[in-house]
Regions:
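Short loop/helix-cap segments at secondary-structure boundaries that form the rim of catalytic
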Residues: 25, 46, 120-124, 140-142, ...
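Beta1-alpha1 glycine-rich phosphate/pyrophosphate-binding loop at the start
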Residues: 7-63, 67-71, 145-179
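Short glycine-/acidic-enriched loop or helix-start segments at secondary-structure transitions
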Residues: 21, 44, 89, 119-121, ...
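Short, well-ordered coil/turn residues at beta-beta hairpins
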Residues: 13, 111-113, 150, 218-221, ...
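FAD-site-proximal beta/loop scaffold in flavoenzymes
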Residues: 119, 125-141, 220-268, 272-282
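A Rossmann-like FAD-binding core segment of flavoenzymes
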Residues: 72-90, 95-97, 103, 165-244, ...
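FAD-binding core/adjacent interface of flavoenzyme oxidoreductases
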Residues: 1-12, 79-144, 217-218, 241-244, ...
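Structured catalytic cores of enzymes that bind and process phosphorylated ligands/cofactors
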Residues: 2, 7-33, 96-98, 187-196, ...
Length: 292
């Protein structure tokens, strides 16, 4: 009997790797949850033509995304469209945080994709001290204060809305085209190059040299560095270090797809997703044997 929000496997990411893992989890009748965007992979969607996927020559990224979505629907796999802001290794299980909710899983598969937006100076150093990746988690700390919000995806504008409803002033820099507008939101035309402050974030410096004083900085990214998401995760050249079975240095945690490094290929991602899922099942079986 499972508790509410308790799963065998949590899969983070709805690119080809995460979808591959989810499909195989459904086939193996595991209790799992799939986190990600209902629009699946923006990277795949933008691909004009994919010519190296076996048996599907010259398929567009848009069509491939549509076929992946249809496969999920056919298998009654539901996407939980919540952004995971933290994964915590509790020893024999993992706790995942998404907004105000908690999810428990015995194993985790990271299919978060390659980090497309590089961290800026001070971002990691001041994380938790004025820098946040989660609007709903930390927004209430900035009621009637001045904040900066840096976003790389339109889907996060609901979170921008949430923050604008709390803060006195919001400096907003979207790295994409948008007509988002709100009375207390000022659009920045120059990107931030650093978060300033010693013990706590107190401002940002822009590429044009301007300095803006703020009380906090929110980065609303499609994906954050995996070792920020899960502390203690071993990295190699900016990617998650994995063995051939897609296991990481943390027991029960597996990774697949672009987040494990080059080559960034759809066929590779799908194969790794399959491997990660079967390795997770092997891990769960061993875990169950120890308990019994």
């Amino acid at each position: 009997m499972y508790e509410t929000n308790s799963y065998d496997i949590a899969i983070i990411g709805t690119g080809p790797a995460g979808i591959s893992a989810a499909i195989n989890a459904a086939i193996r009748k595991k209790k799992f949850i799939l986190f990600g965007s209902e629009n699946l992979s923006a990277k795949v969607e933008r691909s004009h033509l994919i010519s190296n996927y076996p048996a599907l020559p010259e398929i567009s990224g848009k069509e491939l995304n549509e076929r992946l979505a249809a496969h999920l629907k056919q298998m009654d796999i539901v996407i939980t469209a919540e952004r995971i802001t933290g994964v915590y290794n509790m020893g024999k299980y993992f706790m995942l945080l998404a907004d105000q909710k908690e999810y428990k899983a015995d194993a985790v598969i990271l299919a978060t994709g390659a980090q497309t937006v590089k961290e800026i100076k001070g971002e990691r150093e001041l994380l938790g001290r004025g820098v946040s990746y989660c609007a709903t988690c930390d927004g209430n700390f900035y009621k009637d204060k001045t904040i900066a919000v840096i976003s790389d995806n339109k889907e996060s504008e609901e979170e921008v809305d949430f923050l604008a409803g709390l803060a006195r002033k919001v400096y907003f820099y979207p790295s994409y085209k948008t007509d988002y507008s709100k009375e207390n939101v000022e659009h920045l035309t120059s990107p931030a190059v650093s978060v300033d402050g010693e013990r706590h974030a107190d401002g940002i410096t822009l590429k044009d040299g301007a300095h803006i004083a703020v009380d906090g900085v929110f980065f609303l990214k499609q994906s954050v560095s995996a070792d920020v998401l899960l502390g203690g995760l071993e990295m190699s050249n900016g990617s998650i270090a994995v063995d051939r079975d897609m296991s990481t240095n943390i027991k029960g945690c597996f990774a697949c797809g672009d987040c494990t490094g080059k080559p960034y290929q759809i066929a590779k991602a799908i194969g790794e997703g399959n491997t990660a899922l079967h390795s997770a099942i092997t891990y769960l079986s061993a875990l169950k044997s120890k308990i019994e």
